[in-house]
């Protein structure tokens, strides 16, 4: 079983944990519908950058 040879300091522990924080996804507003969506993703209505790119049908 692996056991550390020397104790890691609080500073080194903090440096390692500095990349663990969660970030929220950036939202944009579609100019056509005014709907919020993730950046660089198609909206639920099928619009991307103000143009209709996907035909959305009802799910059955």
From Swiss-Prot:
Region of interest (Disordered), residue spans: 1-47
Source organism superkingdom: Bacteria
Keyword check for Ribonucleoprotein: yes
Statement: the UniProt record of this protein carries the keyword Transit peptide: no
Gene Ontology CC annotations of this record: large ribosomal subunit
Feature: compositional bias, Basic residues: 7-16
GO molecular function term, any single one: structural constituent of ribosome
One Pfam entry name: Ribosomal_L32p
UniProt entry keywords in alphabetical sequence: Ribonucleoprotein, Ribosomal protein
GO biological process: translation
Family membership noted in the UniProt record: Belongs to the bacterial ribosomal protein bL32 family.
Name of protein: Large ribosomal subunit protein bL32
Gene: rpmF
């Amino acid at each position: 079983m692996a056991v550390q040879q020397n104790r890691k300091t609080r500073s080194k522990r903090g440096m390692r944990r500095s990349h663990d924080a969660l970030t929220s996804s950036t939202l944009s507003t579609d100019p056509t519908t005014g709907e919020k969506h993730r950046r660089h993703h198609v909206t639920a209505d099928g619009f991307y950058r103000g143009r209709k790119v996907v035909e959305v049908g009802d799910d059955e």
